[in-house]
Every structure is written in C-alpha cells, then in structure tokens.
Design a protein with these regions (language model features):
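Low-complexity, acidic/polar, glycine-enriched regions of mature
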Residues: 1-177
Length: 177
C-alpha cells in the first residue's frame, strides 16, 4: 500500500524574483501525492503528485487572478500539473535526487528534485500501526519551458518576473496500517 501525502501538514511553494529586486512567494493550496517506498531497495521507490493549478496563491488576489490567465497557468484548459518520478538516487546519507517528468499546461519536461529525508515517526501516537515520513524537495524550473509568459515592459527595459522559479515541496507522507 503506498504512502499518501498529508495535505494538512505539507506545502507546495514557489519563489520567483520580481523586477530583480524582491522575491515573490506563492503556494498551491490543493495537491495530492503518493509514495511507493521500497525500504529494502530505495532506488526502486517511486513518487507522483498532482497540483490543482487554480489554487495558486501569492496572498494578493489580483496577482493570483493574473496567474490563472491563459498566458500564465491557463487553469481553465489545464486544471492540473503533475510530476511522476522515473528514477531515484544516488543516495548520500539522508539526501538523494528524484528524477522525473513535470507536466504543466500539457508540456512535459524532465525535472530533478534534490531531496532531504527529514525522518520517520512510527508509531504515530494514538494511531497504532500508522507511520509518518517527511521529505523536503527542491528544484528550479524555467517558466518558459512550460509556456508561462510575461511581456517586457518597454519603459524599464526588463521583464518583471524572472524566468527561473524555485520550487520547494515540504511533504509529510502517511502510511495506514
């Protein structure tokens, strides 16, 4: 039985430079994922996840509405983005890499996450047989690879939003007995 993401104790975050001056932080409020963990052979493990793109939130409603538009995430035509691992490893202590395919707006690109294993809690108090395991995964993607567009502002001669976007997934997985 696979491990499932606990959405109440997990986060999908992103960080992007705005006018090269400040960093805008955002998150997706609704997502799910599974981890098929092979404890004897971790390289044989796999992970996949789905994010509801319409749940994007930067804390500023007009910006969030803009991010949902056709030339950005186009949430009407592409309500989800997905990630599916293709390979896991190499391992160095509690750190490893997850190689996989990220699909945004129907465009699939290979993406590698650098992952830190934060540990396991077993058994979970008051829940006999339940286990929790936490990971923090980081990557950087180029928004142009997924046709997420911004237009240059002629008056300042630059693009307001950087091409590179840092993604951080802080995940707690639960395994039921």
């Amino acid at each position: 039985m696979p491990w499932k993401v606990d959405p109440d104790n997990s986060e999908v975050l992103f960080f992007v430079k705005h006018f090269r001056l400040t960093t805008v932080r955002g998150r997706f409020k609704k997502f799910e994922g599974t981890l098929d963990m092979n404890e004897e052979n971790p390289q044989a493990s796999s992970v996949e996840g789905t994010v509801e793109t319409a749940t994007i939130s930067t804390g500023i409603a007009p910006r969030d509405m803009d991010l949902r538009r056709r030339n950005r995430f186009n949430v009407r035509d592409f309500p989800q983005m997905t990630y599916k691992s293709t390979r896991i490893g190499p391992f160095e202590g509690n750190r490893f890499q997850v190689f996989g395919d990220l699909t945004i707006k129907g465009i699939t690109r290979p993406v590698v996450f650098d992952v830190e294993d934060k540990g396991e809690l077993s058994p979970v108090k008051g829940m006999p047989g339940w286990r929790r395991h936490a990971f923090e995964a980081r990557t950087r993607v180029n928004r142009k690879d997924f046709d997420i567009k911004w237009f240059p502002l002629a008056e300042i001669g630059s693009i307001p939003v950087a091409e590179d976007i840092d993604v951080v997934c802080k995940m707690q997985f639960i395994k039921e007995p």
